[in-house]
């Protein structure tokens, strides 16, 4: 029997792992043990990619093998999340609903970092008395953190005139400080805080409740979308105090008709597209020498797995791109572009293929 080469062995193991990862996306389980399993698979996936690069292998299953330092960093992050979830699974919160979005890396790193967070509402802060100079921040419904004694505890965030905070081990911990934000976005060192339809003055404080809560899925999408928002788009974000981040570099303009608690607009602003996500995903709104396409947008790891699995549906599409992203956008979020010979073929594809809930679908047309 012929012995497998290192590349063949690693390719086989990677394929099996990525099939299991995609199963997690498709099943969309809501128990904590499933999320622990998911992050273990992500760790093993990056361990394989790390090993491949050590052997000088630059491609596995048509997938580019990233540099060693990237695979190492991703593996360490996966271990961090896996260990945190294992600890949480031993707490009294283990029977709560835990989804991939609740335990994703983006929310874990969002302030307050190294905490799990669920739900959230928006607090609007207006600088210089100017309604057009507004920034928005998340007041989390639930923050899960490790106490000084190593026990997982749960609390709700509160908002005061001075910032957004939570009580940790009896101490007030601010994860957004409005004075620091005012130094970045204002000129007169004055600001107004509006939360839940109320204006909060220097002596007031309000805590998060269950009314008008934004889900973790919506928050993640808003965090992903924030880096591409224009100044007229009010995005939900929680920038670190004293640190400027690309997602919140410029003040947003806030209008009375803006929807802060609804699903984020998933339009991909691409001159090649004539339509995008809408109530009628398959409605053609342009004409000319175009071909039907869809954009699949989501986490790069899930897209790589999805691209691999789509090979068995090759009869239902014409071409599929590698994973790509817009310059300046969130590097963890990618896009796959799939082209079709006709609208009929595209409709069949959408009927036959199961797309994970974590992947956004944008339907359109592209000039050839």
Swiss-Prot record:
Composition bias, Polar residues: 227-236
Region (DNA-binding domain): 290-368
Protein name, as recorded: Regulatory protein E2
S-S bridge residues: none
This protein's UniProt keywords: Activator, DNA replication, DNA-binding, Early protein, Host nucleus, Isopeptide bond, Phosphoprotein, Repressor, Transcription, Transcription regulation, Ubl conjugation
Record's function text: Plays a role in the initiation of viral DNA replication. A dimer of E2 interacts with a dimer of E1 in order to improve specificity of E1 DNA binding activity. Once the complex recognizes and binds DNA at specific sites, the E2 dimer is removed from DNA. E2 also regulates viral transcription through binding to the E2RE response element (5'-ACCNNNNNNGGT-3') present in multiple copies in the regulatory regions of the viral genome. Activates or represses transcription depending on E2RE's position with regards to proximal promoter elements including the TATA-box.
GO MF term set: DNA binding; DNA-binding transcription factor activity; nucleotide binding
Highest taxon, organism lineage: Viruses
Pfam family, one: PPV_E2_N
Localisation: Host nucleus
Family, as annotated: Belongs to the papillomaviridae E2 protein family.
Xref: HAMAP family: PPV_E2
Post-translational modification, as annotated: Phosphorylated.
Keyword Calcium: no
Source organism (scientific name): Human papillomavirus 45
Crosslink feature (Glycyl lysine isopeptide (Lys-Gly) (interchain with G-Cter in SUMO)) location: 297
UniProt-annotated stretches for the region Transactivation domain: 1-207
Gene Ontology terms: cellular component: host cell nucleus
InterPro entries xref list: E2/EBNA1_C_sf, Nucleotide-bd_a/b_plait_sf, Papillomavirus_E2_C, PPV_E2_N, Reg_prot_E2, Regulatory_protein_E2_N, Regulatory_protein_E2_N_1, Regulatory_protein_E2_N_2
Subunit structure of this chain's protein: Binds DNA as homodimer. Interacts with protein E1; this interaction greatly increases E1 DNA-binding activity. Interacts with protein L1; this interaction enhances E2-dependent replication and transcription activation. Interacts with protein L2; this interaction inhibits E2 transcriptional activity but not DNA replication function E2. Interacts with protein E7; this interaction inhibits E7 oncogenic activity. Interacts with host TAF1; this interaction modulates E2-dependent transcriptional regulation. Interacts with host BRD4; this interaction mediates E2 transcriptional activation function.
GO annotation, biological process: DNA replication; DNA-templated transcription; regulation of DNA replication; viral DNA genome replication
Spans annotated as Disordered: 227-251
């Amino acid at each position: 029997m012929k012995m497998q080469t290192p590349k063949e062995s690693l390719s086989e193991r990677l394929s099996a792992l990525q099939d299991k990862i995609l199963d997690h996306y498709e099943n969309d389980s809501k128990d904590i043990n499933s999320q622990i399993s998911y992050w273990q698979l992500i760790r093993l996936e990056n361990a394989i990619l790390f090993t491949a690069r050590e052997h000088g292998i630059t491609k596995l299953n048509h997938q580019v093998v990233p540099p060693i330092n990237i695979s190492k960093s991703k593996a360490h992050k996966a271990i961090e999340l896996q260990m945190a979830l294992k600890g949480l699974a031993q707490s009294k919160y283990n029977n709560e609903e835990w989804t991939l979005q609740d335990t994703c890396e983006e929310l874990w790193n969002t302030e307050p970092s190294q905490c799990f967070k669920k739900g959230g509402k928006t607090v609007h802060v207006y600088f210089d008395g100017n309604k057009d100079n507004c920034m928005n921040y998340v007041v989390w419904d639930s923050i899960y953190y490790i106490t000084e004694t190593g026990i997982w505890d749960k609390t709700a965030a509160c908002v005061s005139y001075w910032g957004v905070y939570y009580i940790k081990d009896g101490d007030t911990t601010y994860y957004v400080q409005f004075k620091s934000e005012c130094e970045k976005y204002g000129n007169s060192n004055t600001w107004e805080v509006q939360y839940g339809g109320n204006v909060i003055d220097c002596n007031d404080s309000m805590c998060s409740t269950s009314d008008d809560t934004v889900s973790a899925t919506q928050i993640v999408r808003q965090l992903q979308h924030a880096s591409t928002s224009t100044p007229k788009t009010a995005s939900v974000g929680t920038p670190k105090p004293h640190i400027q981040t690309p997602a919140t570099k410029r003040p947003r303009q806030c209008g009375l008709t803006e929807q802060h608690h609804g699903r984020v607009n998933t339009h991909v602003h691409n001159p090649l597209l004539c339509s995008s996500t809408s109530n009628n995903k398959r409605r053609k709104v342009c004409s000319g020498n175009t071909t039907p396409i869809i954009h699949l947008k989501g986490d790069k790891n899930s897209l790589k797995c999805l691209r691999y699995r789509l090979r068995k549906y090759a009869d239902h599409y014409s071409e599929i791109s590698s994973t790509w992203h817009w310059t300046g956008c969130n590097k963890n979020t990618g896009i796959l572009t799939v082209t079709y010979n006709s609208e009929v073929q595209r409709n069949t594809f959408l009927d036959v293929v199961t797309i994970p809930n974590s992947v956004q679908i944008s339907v359109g047309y592209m000039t050839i």
